[in-house]
């Protein structure tokens, strides 16, 4: 389970999208529960990072791309 603020989530997505050691990342999307129990929905590409409140969610983050390095990507969520 990952708990991050909206700012931390934005920064993490941006780093994953721009770190070549993660692979060729096209998109990062999913849901994350904040410390206060509220849900955030993330939908990020290199061109736009959209984070918005969500009424319901499931703790999941999906990284879409080619030649992805799971170990490096997972390190960003710790």
Predicted regions mapped to residue ranges:
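P-loop NTP-binding site
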Residues: 1-78
